[in-house]
């Protein structure tokens, strides 16, 4: 077999390394991260769902003053039946809640870490030297996301495992495993539709129907659960994502939005100031042009030159990343797929040969990856991006693309010549430098969010008032120890004051930020006139990016 995975199954001996990896990862998390690490609101939201299910046995939230529930804009929504639920999928947090009941805090990261270990198990079946796989995986944002309660790595695991089963002829089982990933990430619906289209074009009817048969039960069960829980088969996220924060748009503005999405999600990596965009295009265009060579060994000199440019450019981007100290904000402008994962160079440099490879599995995987990359930017909402790290919307296919990239480099002879080896080493080094920065940022930010949470929890008052939409998700334990009142509008402020007076609450914790204000100075003055600060505020910072003021306010006699 010239490409893809080898036929032998995964033995117990081969599982030893992934098991050791999982244990070491959990020990790393225990040593350097809080028990419930919070990077941004998205994964903090999932921790809130987890806590709510653990304490109340429900994915729906109760609040003594529903008008002041910390909705965080669209992060939490009220259903037609009046119940409040998260915008995000509840299924991973619920599974994690059950694990935490059994294993305590160690259960928070168990699913992501074990998922990455399983990805390792499958990827180590790839032909060739194993260290190449390990280095390439280390140079991608997989380890970073395995240290957070987030669905990216479990979803990537289902895709990678399904691909391995698909290659081995276990098509029905592959369909079932793939569809299990639908419970994690909605992007897999797109990936599944693309795969169906490819199989139809190849007239692989038998394979397609077997895959669909395996996928039918998990997919139907998900649609049924979403309908029963949320009144919509797409769930809350799937049914509202496209309209969140999106203004009315003309055809021209929508066209510009799509073009921006392609740049944002495939290329952008703003660590070189105003030169970032020109440098990114200068790095990618030669590699993409070389990828149109009619064979792996054709245009060899041009491929090597393009590879050198790509490797040197991504090394420059990676080195410049370390000068950035705003660990959160820089993550909003550094997630272009091909710059942020330089080990995908082999995919770009050998694009056409991979698409036309004689091995049907390799060609199908390459076509699936390319079509997914080209379709997803049309579907993403640029008004609902927020802070992230790396190309998170492509995490699901990155392991498969890494396999294709290494395979392409082998076939193109990059591992035999000095120049080719240097290109591969430089791309791997660039990726590892980026991921070391990511883990450093993760340790810093999660420590800061934990400090902010502990500061609020340490104050004995049981009510928290804030106009910051992201406070509950950045401090996910607080809503279950105290009542949080959101005052992001004049109406909410009035409702909060009425609630405080109705419940005879004479003092509360006020959390503000000089950088993000939803209420005006006049509205804040109205609140502080009735409940003046009882002392100087405590100033806290998260990730050198966000400043917070925490103070106690007490009603005047």
Language-model segment annotations:
Residues 1, 14-22, 176, 213-216, ...:
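Signature aromatic-anchored transmembrane alpha helix within multi-pass, membrane-resident enzymes
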Residues 68-80, 230-354:
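Membrane-lumen/periplasm interface segments of multi-pass, membrane-embedded glycan/lipid transferases
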Residues 121-124, 138, 154-178, 196-198, ...:
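Specific aromatic-rich, kink-prone transmembrane helix
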Residues 184, 329-347, 364, 385-412:
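Hydrophobic/aromatic-rich transmembrane helices and adjacent perimembrane loops
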Residues 388, 422-478, 485:
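Membrane-embedded, lumen/periplasm-facing catalytic core of multi-pass transferases
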